[in-house]
Amino acid sequence: MFGLGGQELVLILLIVLLLFGAQKLPELAKGLGKGIKEFKKAQNEIEEEFNKATDDSSSKEKKETKA
């Protein structure tokens, strides 16, 4: 995962804990999870639009070559 080992992840978590406090961590994790979910949703929508566009253009080319 991004070239980080276990020790690096623990260190990052400790720093986050010190900066934000234990009470804010669940709220931060929830916000991060929502952000990742929205990012993946947008990524999937872009991929679907790209696939539709490439499928449409390839089907038009096939129709033109048949005519």
UniProtKB/Swiss-Prot annotation:
Q: Fetch the InterPro entries from UniProt.
A: TatA/B/E, TatA/E
Q: Name one GO molecular function term.
A: protein transmembrane transporter activity
Could you tell me where this protein is found in the cell?
Cell inner membrane
Please give the superkingdom of this protein's source: Bacteria
Which key words tag this protein in UniProt? Cell inner membrane, Cell membrane, Membrane, Protein transport, Translocation, Transmembrane, Transmembrane helix, Transport
Please list which residues make up the signal peptide.
none
Topology with respect to the bilayer: Single-pass membrane protein
A single cellular component GO annotation: TAT protein transport complex
Entry's Gene Ontology BP terms:
protein transport by the Tat complex
What is the protein's major site of localization?
A: membrane
List the transmembrane segments: 1-21
Q: Which NCBIfam families match?
A: PRK14861.1, tatAE
Q: Which family does it belong to?
A: Belongs to the TatA/E family.
Assembly and binders = Forms a complex with TatC.
Briefly, what is this protein's role? Answer: Part of the twin-arginine translocation (Tat) system that transports large folded proteins containing a characteristic twin-arginine motif in their signal peptide across membranes. TatA could form the protein-conducting channel of the Tat system.
What is this protein's name?
A: Sec-independent protein translocase protein TatA
